[in-house]
Design a protein with these regions (language model features):
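Bacterial N-terminal signal peptides
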Residues: 1-11
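C-terminal beta-sandwich/jelly-roll accessory domains of carbohydrate-active enzymes
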Residues: 702-820
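Active-site machinery of serine-nucleophile hydrolases
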Residues: 458-461, 465-571
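Primarily recognizes the serine-hydrolase "nucleophile elbow" in alpha/beta-hydrolase
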Residues: 571, 578-625
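Short beta-strand/loop motif that positions the catalytic acidic residue
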Residues: 624, 630-633
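C-terminal catalytic histidine-bearing segment of alpha/beta-hydrolase fold enzymes
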Residues: 638, 642-746, 750-751, 789
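Compositionally biased alpha-helical segments
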Residues: 13-317, 787-819
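A domain-start/cap signature at the N-terminus of enzymes
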Residues: 274-459, 788, 792-795, 801
Length: 820
């Protein structure tokens, strides 16, 4: 009988260890400790002499993961049990002679043949080099690929091998006359959580031995177990899609959720989700029906007309994502003692401000509706004098307090409408332009929205930067996946109730297939099945590099391309500004390392891939304390790890939340197989926009804003422009420090001017606030701080952060010398 016990337990290795980190991640593999990333792991000295290693190393045979030991919550040995299925392939491996020690960008990689061989063509300084490779070890998680013409040990994720290629390789490795060989393939797929392939392997087994009538009965328990695992996997996928806001897809699949031989707990979970959707749909109908019944009871014509507009807006935009706004209205909708005006006021104010802020005074609720309209007009008006007129009208409105304005802004849709999509066949895909620096051309950037995008739901976002020879659009493809025809995708998917889950085949490896499919496909809306779509992320890709650019220049133009694109996207799309992640590949990775450290207040995490930390990064390294880093690189990508170790070692020594992944035997790659772990990592971190204390470094006049402190005029010895690099002897970064203790704010800044931006999320405006800059008190008087509508609106108009608007600003001249 097929043994499932070893298939569903975690994979095990010799001396396997499981490390639980404080952020909830679990690392598995062989445990080691190092004092620095560039050193070779050594066993601890028996007498305890030598430096105590501060860095944890986990080796899982595919990659090595480095984190600070300060991030560890628990270390435990895994229980011994059934190990992974492994297929060992015979190859004529080269053991000496020409040796690969540095791997540049791949020019062409052929598919694996049935014997597990392929030709890998890489670019070198002497031109293209062809290397014949062969898989020697194949497990459910990783494959060892060795050189046949050159000495080379490379590791790749098994998930990156296309299904068809993998199946051919496996079938070539078994004795097709042996029942146990087919079972081994089934166990292999089970351990890789590839349940459809595991089921197919058992079907192939029964077809290969039609004379074995006992096989069907013998395999029945295993087939039932696979059905359970498949249903469990499907339910987990549906929960993921639900959390991503893809309610239409989830609801449709739940209606046809498989029930044959599925356990009660799984069916109950699916049934509860379906019931919840049906309940929310019924609530939506009830809200509109109740409003329709109440509207005729309003005798004032103006009020009735305004209410009808709001009712029509709600009919178009009320959804599962904002249904909670109607809680107060629904609780009182059937109260015979409450007047119609009060009930409608609850509906209107709940719609505008959320149920917790709902009120029962209809004139006030309608006034709030008018204020929201004025806020939107102000935010999209490009002419200053017209904005001032709108602001004057807003101030004349009764109740237009700073608190109300901030509350309305946080519940509004984005202020600017997006343009038309690139093509009707590519929903949610936009090409936009935003002004660059003065005298510079406008910046083009691309945006891909997730399926079923709703402007009332806040979405996490990825800002991604391309490498040399790549485009912004290719970065969108890396994160969101290629375009596919949904009809063709559903035809390939055996279980129509199962939402497609992409494999880890690289986007650039699918381009030719995509082009052929697009030529044959009818003009119907296509879809992306990449992981950004599954997890519900908005992807933003600025075209930041110029034609033929080969390296990152650390310039103001490049920073502006990223920051201006992000702000413009936040004006147009519903982006959760506390969950914006900055990513980049190759020279784009160099850029995000620099930009992430220069502006740590903007990002929930920074993801440099095949990147180099250079120039300003070496001076800004302490800024990494405030933003998590996830660095991915290849063992044979030149000397990158050795160079990056200068900064990474400092991050890890001081316990910063920095993770480094080194793929074994790999070179200058984009490491698409790491994407699932990256999404898991991103899901664990949010930006803290109001830290109680920070100390950051800066050397450029555009690296001037840190959370709630803005600088102007760096000292001469601290300001070094990129065209004057390297800095002259004696140059040092300027420091800015901020600390909030209760209602006391203390700032130290080595600049000529300091501006402090304030919000009730930082200090209590109803209590006395004390502000000290460079040891001098600049504010500690009555009356208390007051919010200013102009400050709030200008802050949101320029920064486009509706979640954290600043309410007021204090400027102070420090008397320090300015730079050039």
């Amino acid at each position: 009988m097929l043994c499932l016990a070893g298939a569903i337990i975690p994979a095990v290795w010799a001396s396997a260890t499981e490390v639980v980190l404080k952020d909830g991640r679990v690392l598995r593999g062989k445990l080691g400790e190092v004092a620095g990333l560039a050193e070779i792991p050594q066993p601890n000295s028996p007498d305890g002499e030598g430096p105590s290693p501060s860095i944890l190393l986990m080796d899982d045979d595919l990659s090595r993961t480095f984190v600070s030991k300060r991030l560890i919550k628990e270390v435990r040995q895994e229980e011994t049990g059934h190990g992974e299925e492994k297929f060992s392939l015979h190859q004529s491996v080269k053991r000496n002679g020409l040796t690969i020690r540095s791997v540049g960008p791949a020019m062409r990689v052929q598919p694996f043949d049935e014997f597990g061989r392929r030709i890998y063509t890489m670019y070198t300084g002497k031109g293209p080099v062809d290397v014949i490779q062969g898989i020697t070890d194949l497990t459910p998680r990783w494959a060892k690929v060795e050189g046949i013409t050159h000495v080379w040990d490379m590791r790749i994720a098994t998930s990156s091998i296309p299904r068809e290629e993998l199946q051919k390789i496996l079938l070539k490795q078994i004795n097709t006359k042996d029942v146990e060989s087919y079972k081994k393939i089934a166990r292999f797929y089970l351990q890789g959580e590839r349940y459809a392939e595991a089921r197919q392997a058992l079907d192939d087994l029964m077809k290969a031995f039609p004379e074995r009538k006992d096989l069907q009965e013998q395999l029945a328990p295993s087939i039932r177990a696979i059905k359970q695992l498949s249903a469990q996997q499907l339910l987990a996928e549906l929960r993921l899609r639900r959390d991503a806001g893809q309610h239409g897809l989830v609801w449709d699949v739940l209606k046809k959720f498989p029930s044959d031989e599925i356990g009660g707990e799984i069916l109950q979970g699916a049934g509860d989700m379906l019931k919840d959707y049906e309940t929310k749909a019924a609530r939506r109908v009830k809200v509109l029906e109740k409003m329709d019944a109440l509207l005729p009871k309003i005798t004032d014509n103006y009020q009735r007309e305004e209410l009808q507009k709001i009712r029509d807006e709600m009919a178009a935009e009320l959804s599962i994502n904002n249904m909670d706004r109607m809680a107060a209205f629904l609780q009182n909708a059937d109260d015979a003692q409450m007047p119609a005006q009060a009930k409608l006021a609850l509906a209107v104010s709940g719609w505008l401000l959320g149920s917790d802020s709902a009120i029962d005074q209809l004139p006030v609720a309608l006034s709030i509706y008018g204020i929201r309209r004025q806020l939107r007009e102000y935010l999209i008006e490009p002419v200053k004098i017209k904005r001032e007129a709108i602001l004057d009208g807003l101030k004349s409105q009764e109740g237009s307090s700073p608190g109300l304005i901030a509350d309305l802004l946080s519940h509004m849709k984005p202020q600017a409408d997006p343009p038309e999509v690139v093509s009707p066949e590519r929903p949610g895909y936009y090409k936009l332009e935003v002004p660059g620096l003065p005298k510079e051309p406008p910046i083009t950037y691309w945006v891909q929205l997730p399926p079923e995008y709703d402007p009332y739901k806040l979405y996490p976002a990825i800002v991604t930067m391309n490498g040399a020879g790549n485009t912004a659009e290719s970065q969108i493809d890396w994160w969101a996946g290629d375009w596919v025809n949904p009809r063709r995708a559903s035809e390939k998917n055996e279980d129509a109730s199962n939402p497609p889950v992409p494999d880890e085949k690289k986007p650039d490896e699918k381009k030719s297939d995509e082009k052929k499919s697009a030529e044959k496909a009818p003009a119907v809306p296509m879809t992306r099945n990449g992981h950004a779509a599954r997890y519900g992320y908005i992807v933003i890709a600025p075209q930041w590099s110029v034609e033929h650019q080969k390296k990152y220049n650390y310039s103001a133009r490049e920073h502006a391309a990223v920051l201006n694109s992000l702000r413009d996207a936040c004006r147009r799309f519903s982006i959760d500004t506390d969950r914006v992640y900055l990513s980049g590949y190759s020279m784009g990775g160099d850029a995000v390392w620099d930009i992430g450290l220069a502006h740590p207040d903007l990002w929930a995490g920074v993801i440099p891939i095949s990147a180099l930390a250079d120039r300003y990064c070496n001076f800004y390294w302490e800024n990494a304390k405030y933003v998590p880093f996830y660095v991915v690189l290849g063992e044979f990508d030149g000397s990158k790890l050795t160079k990056d170790a200068l900064d990474l070692d400092r991050y890890l020594k001081y316990g910063y939340n920095a993770t480094t992944i080194e793929y074994q035997g790999r070179g200058h790659d984009n490491f698409h197989e790491e994407i699932l772990r990256i999404f898991d990592w991103m899901g664990r971190f949010r930006r803290n926009f109001f830290p109680r204390e920070f100390t950051c470094s800066t050397m450029r006049d555009w690296d001037c804003f840190f959370w709630w402190v803005e600088l102007d005029g760096l000292p001469p010895k601290s300001q070094v422009d990129p065209e004057h690099w390297p800095p002259p002897a004696g140059s040092r970064a300027a420091q800015v420090k901020g600390k909030i203790t209760g209602n006391n704010i203390n700032v130290f800044a080595g600049s000529a001017q300091v501006s402090i931006w304030l919000s009730p999320q930082m200090v209590d405006f109803k209590q006395r606030v004390s502000i000290v800059v460079n040891g001098q008190q600049i504010y500690a008087k009555e009356p208390f701080l007051q919010g200013d509508p102009r400050t709030i609106l200008e802050d949101v108009r320029t920064r486009a952060d509706r979640q954290h608007p600043f309410w007021t600003r204090l400027d102070n001249s420090t008397g320090r010398a300015r730079g050039k």
